[in-house]
Amino acid sequence: MNEKIMSDQKKIEEAVYQLLEALGEDPNREGLLDTPKRVAKMYQEMFAGLNEDPKDQFTAVFSEEHEDVVLVKDIPFYSMCEHHLVPFHGLAHVAYIPSDGCVTGLSKLARAVEVVSKRPQLQERLTVQIANALEEALKPKGVLVMIEAEHMCMTMRGIKKPGSKTVTRVVRGICQSDKETRQEIIAMIHHN
């Protein structure tokens, strides 16, 4: 568990208590009595990726005779918008083209998504951080990361447009320089 967050649990509890008071609620009433503790515990889980390095997920690396696209698509994730501290959630699609047959376990791609999504985050940064981790750890010929997400800050407040999705993409290496490769990966992502 993230030591920094764990050591600040009491501080989080106090802040939630004060927030409830500032909202005009009675933090000592039965329904709210344990809320500060529950919220602090929830934040431990939701922000567990703060002190983790997504590159550490790529410890299992194998040499295989595979030089074509590796894609893990439709990876569900949840994160917290750093602007409003409300969730955004969606699907991540992570593709790479191995260099010299250097591949990783498929679950490692999902684990990297998990680590960077468990932070106060922006979708744009989330996309870049996944691509960076994959690129630095495996040194592939190309990387393409695409994320589609619904942001509760657009659904529950402000413009109130439920169901609207934000799509971000990072394309590197041969996936960027070779239009045909890029289009093939995007077609694979959209293929059911």
Curated annotation (Swiss-Prot):
One Pfam family here: GTP_cyclohydroI
BP term (GO), one: one-carbon metabolic process
GO molecular function, one term: GTP binding
Annotated keywords: GTP-binding, Hydrolase, Metal-binding, Nucleotide-binding, One-carbon metabolism, Zinc
Residues at which Zn(2+) binds: 81, 84, 153
Reaction equations catalysed: GTP + H2O = 7,8-dihydroneopterin 3'-triphosphate + formate + H(+)
InterPro entries per the UniProt record, alphabetical: GTP-CH-I_C/QueF, GTP-CH-I_N, GTP_CycHdrlase_I, GTP_CycHdrlase_I_CS, GTP_CycHdrlase_I_dom
Entry superkingdom: Bacteria
Enzyme class, spelled out: hydrolase
GO cellular component entries: cytoplasm
Subunit organization: Toroid-shaped homodecamer, composed of two pentamers of five dimers.
Official protein name in the record: GTP cyclohydrolase 1
Source organism (scientific name): Streptococcus mutans serotype c (strain ATCC 700610 / UA159)
Gene symbol of the encoding locus: folE
